[in-house]
Amino acid sequence: MITLHMVVLPFLITLFLLLIIKFLPMNVPDKEKLSPYECGFDPSGSARLPFSMKFFLVAILFILFDLEIILLFPLAWALNSQSHSNAIILASVFVIILTLGLIYEWLKGGLEWTE
């Protein structure tokens, strides 16, 4: 009975959804759908503007350190358990590795904005 619910049923649902997608009408792109929308005005320039690679690198670093904070949030629940030292050691190692990565990026000039 468990096999039916855990293997066969998801397979049948997936097959059903694939069949529905096969028979739905396709969206055919044309010139109007692919053009940028500018509130009824004629486009003044290209919609694909280049951006600075420095901005891209800083954005990636921001995402990495934002994820660090998210991964450290469960530390509060880990400190409620009996093994405080294990949680603190793991969090410290995690922060030290990310700090070493930040120092490496700083020394390589990845945080310098001037071009």
From Swiss-Prot:
Catalytically driven reaction(s): a ubiquinone + NADH + 5 H(+)(in) = a ubiquinol + NAD(+) + 4 H(+)(out)
Topology in the lipid bilayer: Multi-pass membrane protein
Keywords linked to the UniProt accession: Electron transport, Membrane, Mitochondrion, NAD, Respiratory chain, Translocase, Transmembrane, Transmembrane helix, Transport, Ubiquinone
Main location group: mitochondrion
Transmembrane segments: 1-21, 55-75, 87-107
Cross-referenced PANTHER family: NADH-UBIQUINONE OXIDOREDUCTASE CHAIN 3
Function: Core subunit of the mitochondrial membrane respiratory chain NADH dehydrogenase (Complex I) that is believed to belong to the minimal assembly required for catalysis. Complex I functions in the transfer of electrons from NADH to the respiratory chain. The immediate electron acceptor for the enzyme is believed to be ubiquinone.
Family according to the record: Belongs to the complex I subunit 3 family.
Record's protein name: NADH-ubiquinone oxidoreductase chain 3
